Amino acid sequence: DLAAAGYHAVHHSAGRWAGVAIVARQELELTEPVSGLPGELRTDEARWIEATAGGMRIVSTYVPNGRAVDTPTFTEKLTFLDAAAQRAALLGAGEQPVIIGGDLNVTRTDLDVYEPAAFIGSTHVTADERGRLEAMLEAGDLVDAYRHLHPDDQQFTWWDYRQGAFHRGLGLRIDYLLASSSIASGLEECGIARDFRKGRKPSDHAPLLCVLR
């Protein structure tokens, strides 16, 4: 129970496959919540929520997977990323620092892929997706928190359940925390909690944990 643990939340849910939330300690008020992303094609899916906390605008997002290149679902993904960049620009122009966190379903560079050659022609690695992620960073004047502190490290946040991918190190970095450049100097730590992936019936993702002072 969140309240018993000393937390509260705002959330946006849509059935089994989509949902986003922002959770904060009870002493940190969550205000001005906004659910949904202006410009997204699928308004029946819960993939974006915002709230203000601690003087910052916080976003939790879950970008569509895209499934396969040259399909309607891939087009929906690109449209969502375009809309996210537009929203990032609007938020970035405001007075509050911005943090956007979640599963973006894009690898930023080949360093974020265990074997780039294995993904040629697949989603998550295309120039269309990566270009839109960079556009979001630029539009919102955001930094990739993990890469800001670890420019050359190869660590992953997602591993397929099949073929022992986690234990073989066959992963992707597709989960991010993007922060306004104005607060990037306050990033003290940002790492991937791989031990959570070792549990019984784990998620195929591992948490990304960052400390901002």
What annotation goes with each model-predicted range?
Residues 1-68:
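Structured beta-strand-rich core segments of catalytic domains in phosphoester-bond hydrolases
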Residues 3-6, 80-174:
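Metal-dependent phosphoesterases centered on the DNase I-like endonuclease/exonuclease/phosphatase
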Residues 11-14, 39-41, 165-169, 198-200:
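Short Gly/Pro-enriched turn/cap motifs at secondary-structure boundaries
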Residues 16-31, 153, 165-186, 212:
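Conserved beta strand-loop-helix elements of the APE1-like EEP
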Residues 35-37, 144-154, 190-194:
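Acidic carboxylate-rich catalytic motifs and surrounding loops in phosphoryl-/glycosyl-chemistry enzymes
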Residues 38-39, 63-81, 117-122:
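Surface-exposed cleft-lining segments at the edges of enzyme active sites
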